[in-house]
Design a protein with these regions (language model features):
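A short SAM/SAH-binding and catalytic strip from SAM-dependent methyltransferases
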Residues: 260-276
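Class I SAM-dependent methyltransferase SAM/SAH-binding core
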Residues: 193-195, 199-252
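A short acidic, Gly/Pro-enriched loop at the edge of an enzyme's catalytic core
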Residues: 250-263
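C-terminal alpha-helical "lid/dimerization" subdomain adjacent to the S-adenosyl-L-methionine
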Residues: 295-353
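N-terminal accessory segments
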Residues: 1-165, 174, 178-192, 216, ...
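Conserved Class I S-adenosyl-L-methionine
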Residues: 340, 348-369
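A short glycine-rich, Lys/Arg-flanked "PGG" loop and its adjoining helix->strand segment in the class I
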Residues: 276-291
Length: 374
């Protein structure tokens, strides 16, 4: 990999210096197990899976009175439980033999959650989110409570900050991304033109903007699908070069071919119906030597099963996917699929972090940086 990869990696590890990473994999497993046990306990209590079987996912969803648009989530959960050995799947697609968590088992998992979230650098808000999402499963499935109410209680972003910024892997990735931007600013001989897609609460923006200090910037266009996030960002960030716009990546991107120095997409490019098509559009927007910075999850961990799927549900059900995820309920592309998609779009991959063997890889979140050579 490139010298830029080394520079970004050093910056990322400097940002988390003093944090122990040796127990990362075990901590991730503890959080995953808590959610899996919680889902299993709920399904045992409220569905026919507590009896013989096999039972098809649709029947289980009916037992749960799941709203039509959320019924796919039940099948998604059952697939995850099967993957982790907590339920058996019949050849015809039905499920049976669901694990029955004991009270002591649930208590032990909850006790381990506190040390696990601390080991991963998550503030207490993450534990609150996980436990509340388990308590609210019936209402979430019935569409009586929206996941946004869990992520932004009372309209405040503290919980979302815990998920997207205030933790070990986010600090590493954001610092590495900021170093990539700093390097670009040093190399570019004119004011920078930057587009951030799906910027959300600005968790990555907040770490990128300081990297621009002392460098000329023509504009930093902060975009999102939601006016709520744009209004929040206007109040939070200062800078005469900051601009704001509503943008839906499921539709065409702004028509500025070859005019951008940097496109940032942090934990959101997977929301595109076809990632390859999105990257083709991004590549067309970049000036020669321009870069795309992606922060992406490359494997769905069970700890997100009680939140992320609800955020993805559309009015018609599961999100439409036309890339490698078509005909599946996969949320994310794998690392190899991201690398291939970037290269297929004519971009040269310069950064792929964390390095293989780094304990941080257990969190399955990565930074990809690719350059337009055209």
């Amino acid at each position: 990999m490139s010298l830029l990869n080394d520079r970004a990696d050093r910056a990322g590890h400097t940002a988390i210096a003093g944090s122990a990473t040796g127990g990362t994999a075990e901590a991730v497993q503890d959080l995953d197990r808590l959610i899996l046990l919680g889902i299993a306990a709920d399904l045992r209590r409220r569905t026919r899976l507590g009896d013989g079987g096999p039972h098809v996912p649709g029947a289980v969803a009916q037992d749960l009175a799941a709203a039509p648009r959320h019924q796919w989530i039940v099948e998604h959960w059952l697939a995850a439980l099967h993957e982790h050995g907590m339920v058996s799947r019949h050849d015809a697609g039905g499920y049976h033999g669901l694990h029955a968590p004991r009270r002591a088992e649930l208590a032990a998992a909850r006790a381990r959650m506190e040390s696990a979230r601390a080991a991963l650098g998550y503030p207490a808000e993450l534990a609150d989110l996980m436990l509340r999402s388990l308590r609210e499963l019936p209402a979430l499935l019935r569409d009586e409570v929206g996941v946004q109410a869990l992520l932004y209680p009372d309209g405040e972003p503290a919980t979302a900050e815990a998920v997207y910024r205030g933790n070990l892997i986010s600090r590493y990735l954001n610092a590495a991304a900021a170093e990539v931007l700093r390097d670009l600013a040093e190399r570019t001989g004119r004011p920078l033109r930057i587009l951030e897609l799906g910027a959300g609460i600005g968790a990555t923006t907040a770490d990128l903007l300081p990297a621009l200090d002392g460098h000329p910037v023509e504009f930093y266009l902060f975009t999102d699908l939601s006016p709520f996030f744009l209004d929040t960002a206007r109040r939070r960030f200062e800078g005469g070069f900051l601009r704001y716009a509503l943008l839906d990546i499921a539709r065409d991107l702004p028509h500025q071919p070859g005019g951008l120095d940097l496109v940032v997409a942090a934990t959101m490019a997977h929301n595109a119906p076809h990632v390859g098509r999105l990257l083709d559009q991004v590549a067309a927007l970049l000036a020669p030597g321009g870069r795309v910075v992606l922060i992406e999850t490359v494997r769905e961990h069970p700890q997100s099963l009680t939140s992320m799927p609800f955020a993805l549900s559309t009015a018609a059900g599961p999100p439409e996917r036309y890339d490698a995820r078509a005909s599946t309920t996969r949320t994310y592309l794998r690392r190899e699929e991201w690398l291939a998609a970037l290269e297929d779009s004519g971009l040269r991959v310069d950064v792929d972090l964390p390095r293989q063997g780094d304990p941080l890889t257990a969190l399955s979140q990565r930074l990809f940086v690719a350059t337009a050579d055209h």
